[in-house]
Design a protein with these regions (language model features):
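Active-site acidic-Proline motif in GNAT/NAT acetyltransferases
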Residues: 125-127, 131, 159-160
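Basic/polar N-terminal segments that are highly enriched at the extreme N-terminus
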Residues: 1-2
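Acetyl-CoA-dependent GNAT
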Residues: 5, 9-12, 20-127, 135-140, ...
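C-terminal "cap" of GNAT-fold acetyltransferases
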Residues: 113-117, 151-154, 158-165, 169-198
Length: 198
């Protein structure tokens, strides 16, 4: 049985490991769902540079300067980027936020702006799958959403990613039937929304 792992906030010096897991996670999870040329073009070095900048902003509690990691410029809500770590090795990460009316659909905004959460990403090193790391990171995110006063949270999952849908459903998330097309990564990807209530 593998040794225990801990969950802690990400810091700028974790950027390379986070980028490595993100790239490996994309190549593992999205093979056959995303054009192979795009997956092959993913660069740990380029992602490290972007991630270092984002984690630096996050550590200073500054609003994000771009939406490259799922938040809009000027977002004044709460953000968290947590790592699962064993013996200083990063095994996975979970990035989530909460804000009043934190929704991708303007028509869902409510008067008074109820606090809503959003799970932006959850990736595990493919070599560390099946060790409870994803469940632990998700449990941390859900308890944080509740502590922040969120009434609900949502995420988007790539069409055809049945492994992710099954994982999220086991954690209590449900498909809403809503879809969107994401072009932010240079390819057209259809995503399905999932939500959870608190």
């Amino acid at each position: 049985m593998p040794d225990a792992f801990t969950i802690r906030p990400a810091a700028p010096n974790d950027a390379q490991e986070v980028a490595r897991i993100r790239v490996l996670g994309w190549r593992f999870a999205y093979q056959g769902l995303v054009p192979q040329g795009y997956l092959d073009s993913l660069s740990i070095a380029e992602d490290t540079e972007r991630m270092c900048g984002y984690l630096s902003q996050l550590s200073q509690d500054a609003p994000p300067k771009s939406s490259a990691f799922g938040l809009n410029s000027g977002d004044s809500g709460k953000r968290s980027f947590m790592l699962a770590v064993r013996d200083d090795a990063v095994l996975g990460f979970c990035h989530f936020s909460a804000a009043p009316n934190n929704t991708d659909r303007v028509e869902r905004a409510t008067p008074g702006g109820t606090m809503n959460g959003r799970l932006h990403s959850l990736y595990i090193d493919p070599d560390a799958l099946g060790q409870g790391i994803g469940h632990a990171l998700m449990s941390h995110a859900l308890s944080t959403f509740a502590a922040w006063g969120c009434e609900r949270a949502h995420l988007w999952v790539l069409e055809g990613n049945s492994r992710a849908v099954s994982f999220y459903e086991r954690q209590g998330w449900q498909l809403t039937g809503d879809t969107k097309v994401d072009r932010s990564f240079g390819v057209c990807l259809v995503e399905h929304e999932m939500t959870i209530q608190f």
